[in-house]
Amino acid sequence: MEKQINYEKRRLPVPFDSGLMYTVVAIYYVYAYQYIAKFNFSTEINLVLSQVLFLVVPPLLLALIKKYDIKETFRLKAPKPMEVLLMLVISPVMVIAGFCAGFIGLLAVKGIFGRVYIAGDTTDLMSNDIIISLLLVAVLPAVCEELLFRGMIQRGLERIGAGWSIFLSGILFGLFHFDFQRLAAQTLIGFLAAYVVYRTGSIFNGMILHFSNNGLLTIFANYMAGSEVQGAQVVTDPFDVPEFAQIAAQYNISTEQLLGIMAAVFAVFLAISVAVIFGLIIVLRSITRKTVEKPDKIKGSGKGMLIGLPGLLMIGIVYTGLGLMLLNNNMGQKILQFMGML
């Protein structure tokens, strides 16, 4: 039995706020980042400043200006022990699903564009001291990104329905990572985190999932030797390494055939992981059926989301630049340089 949320009494966001936030943060994050870079801070400091100033401050300011209920808007409710336990069970399965989707996405991007785009700054951060890496790549995004997407944006979108809020916030979250090959994986994480936060009413459960995903990937990257990438760059073939060639030669097959077999295996593991996650979601629905709060929908309120179109346009321009650069078109690099992404 879902409880009804009284939006007027609690003063919670509406779709207009979600769209406004996405546009403001997208423009702020994409364009204003280049001004922080002019101070010549380290990559670590740049990341902290961009996450806090661009992802946390705007939604908090909007909530304060419009006098929204901070605790309810951002779902600052302590998670129940059973919920935390379930998050810890879901997390590794989600990481496997995300890794499989990411590998398949990498192959897809290489197949479509012939090359892939590697974000070197993130790779460098993951290869840092393990504690610093976890703080910067796992803890910081888990807190800042969740407050924006599962806080202000998702809460506002709930006025058009819980299902739409989960779907749209997940899509917006995936797009915001500006990465073709990770788009599917990040969107999957966005859907799952959005659903978990909605069902449990606690943003901290979303943070646990987010931290677990980034944290495990960071640990993997931290202990991988010889794979450092300095700066963002285009790589023609990320699989053109001795290890792949040796494995292919061992089984008397080509590297392309090896990658095809790996893609099929990863697809199977992805399907199994998604099935397991679906089963765990059923368990989550069961333990939250008496506590989940049903949002109060308002007919026509979705029109307010149109203010988010400039933000989507901004992100679309970035993806266009990335695509053109992968196609070896000089216009792509010019677009990304103009946007402050290079």
Residue ranges and their predicted role:
Residues L175, A184-Q250:
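Functionally important transmembrane alpha-helices
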Residues E2-E8, Y33, E44-P92, L107-I112, ...:
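Membrane-helix interface linkers and caps
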Residues V24-Y33, V56-L61, F266-S286, P310-M325:
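Hydrophobic core of alpha-helical transmembrane segments in multi-pass integral membrane proteins
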Residues V24-I65, A267-A271, K334-L342:
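Alpha-helical transmembrane segments in multi-pass membrane proteins
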Residues F41-N46, K71-C144, L324-L342:
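Juxtamembrane helix-loop-helix connectors linking adjacent transmembrane helices
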Residues V56-V57, P92, A97, A119-L183, ...:
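Function-critical hydrophobic alpha-helical transmembrane segments in multi-pass membrane proteins
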Residues F39-E44, T123-S127, P238-A267:
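Membrane-interface segments at the starts/ends of alpha-helical transmembrane spans
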Residues P295-L342:
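C-terminal regulatory/interaction regions
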